[in-house]
Design a protein with these regions (language model features):
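N-terminal post-signal-peptidase region of extra-cytosolic proteins
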Residues: 162-166
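Mature secreted bioactive peptide module from preproproteins
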Residues: 1-112, 136-141, 150-156, 169, ...
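Low-complexity, intrinsically disordered tandem-repeat tracts enriched in small residues
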Residues: 114-117, 225, 236-238
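Glycine-rich loop/turn
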Residues: 117-148
């Protein structure tokens, strides 16, 4: 990534409630700008996503909220590593998997998506790299365990600059709930996107690992839980107040 070199990996913390974490560590301990997003799946359904988190350090991490799940559990994430000239290197971290079933079959590679009556593609967000793009409708488990689909533009719109990422996340922080649909576009529930506020209480296990990596300085590297203010195109007074 430009003049930087990263180790990027995911970890799954499995228990009565499970969570995932995406890590990116600059090998030479050089501080740099990065943006991360982490996903937790149950049986191909997206159940938790940690909203975009940006930071400027040599250790970047982002964990999802805990979720009680079973079956085939997977964690993965997306990253943006920014170069000094403003360009960036993007990609997806390797998937970590755990199955609660001893007889679980290996997941087959998907190379194309089916379409609904409206011509919209649908499937798991896990398959976006093998297919070459994400589906229009992403398989997800919403509130109260309702299974359905969320729209790609609601969960992963095209973003390029750090400012675009920050402003998208600011909108999510202000209004995290999005509709959950059936295949025909009927609203059947809701899905809660990850917010910056979710990071207010650091996970003790992750903080302990970070302390081991940094000699007890985990507080310097934990992601910020301070919500990003939404920018408005309102004029302002001399005191900076919008009107």
């Amino acid at each position: 990534a430009g003049s930087y070199s990263y180790d990027c990996y995911t970890t799954l913390y499995y228990g009565n409630a499970s969570k995932g974490c995406l890590w990116a560590v600059e090998k030479n301990k050089k501080d740099a700008q990065a943006a991360l997003k982490t996903y937790l799946y149950e049986n191909d359904n997206l159940v938790e996503e940690a909203g975009w988190s940006t930071s400027n350090s040599y250790i970047h991490l982002l964990d999802t909220k805990k979720h009680t799940i079973s079956g085939d559990i997977r964690v993965e994430g997306d990253y943006r590593f920014y170069h000094d000239n403003g360009d960036y290197t993007s990609g997806s971290a390797p998937v970590v998997r755990y199955s609660t079933s001893r007889s679980a079959a290996e997941r087959m590679a998907v190379t194309s998506y089916p379409t609904n009556a409206k011509g919209e593609t649908y499937g798991s967000y896990l398959d976006r790299n093998t297919v070459g793009q994400a589906p229009d409708l992403i398989a997800a488990m919403g509130e109260n365990g309702v299974e359905g689909y969320i729209r790609l533009n609601d969960i992963a719109p095209e973003l390029f600059t750090l400012e675009e990422i920050r402003q998208y996340q600011a909108q999510v922080d202000a209004n995290p709930v999005i509709p959950l649909y059936d295949l025909n576009g009927k609203v059947i529930g809701s899905f809660v996107r990850g917010t910056t506020q979710d990071l207010a209480a650091p996970d003790p296990v992750i903080a302990q690992k970070l302390d081991q990596m940094t000699g007890g300085k985990s507080a310097n590297f934990l992601p910020s839980a301070q919500p990003i203010p939404v920018k408005h195109d309102y004029p302002t007074t001399a005191n900076g107040e919008s009107y």
